[in-house]
Amino acid sequence: NILKLKSFGYKIIGPEIGDMACGEYGEGKMTEPNEIVNTLKNYFSNLDKNKKLKALVTAGPTNEYIDPVRFITNKSSGKQGYEIAKCLRDNGFDTTLISGKTSIKPLDGVNFVSVETAEEMFKESLNNLPTDVAIFSAAVSDFKVKNYKSTKIKKNEEFNLELEKNIDILNHISNHNSLRPKI
């Protein structure tokens, strides 16, 4: 599939060969964020500056609530997505950043949407289509709580946590031709 995409002229960034997050060595290591940003800067600096293109970026973690005060999440600072959004903005894109909760302040000149859950991120992503460029860099929770409790679970209360799969935002959007961004 990668060879097919390359034959259509798509630029593929990564994966690299090296030590991966799972502790194994091989192809699958994430490309360094600075290299991703530099590749994007080079690509976008060669585009026609007279045409205003739209860009959508997701960043940060999503939280899936167990009860009103507890949640499961994927750890993410959001820095990579914010830097990508900044790069797109600086290259003249009308940029929307959909972000989970981070300590980073919203960027000037970027349309900012704050979300908490994967479902919210999915809905906001759909609301911001069509777009010319979409970069899904958020650490979206793969699972959500099946048996959410609307009141705080007491510490002496028995509770079994059941999970179910969350929607795969990237997969959903990239597999629907009417939604799929050009980049």
Regions found by a protein language model. Give the residues of each.
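Internal gly/pro-rich beta-alpha loop/helix module
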Residues: 1-44
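Glycine-rich phosphate/diphosphate-binding loop of Rossmann-like nucleotide-binding domains
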Residues: 3-7, 49-117
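Short amphipathic alpha-helices and their capping/turn segments at secondary-structure boundaries
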Residues: 5, 37-55, 118-134
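General beta-strand structural signal in soluble alpha/beta enzymes
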Residues: 12-15, 97-99, 136-137
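Short glycine-rich anion-binding loops that position phosphate/pyrophosphate groups of nucleotides
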Residues: 18, 60-64, 138-146
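Short glycine-enriched, charge-decorated loop/helix-capping segments at active-site entrances
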Residues: 26, 70-75, 154-159
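Electropositive phosphate-/nucleotide-binding environments in soluble metabolic enzymes
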Residues: 27-34, 74-78, 82, 115-119, ...
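Glycine-rich phosphate-binding loop
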Residues: 116-183
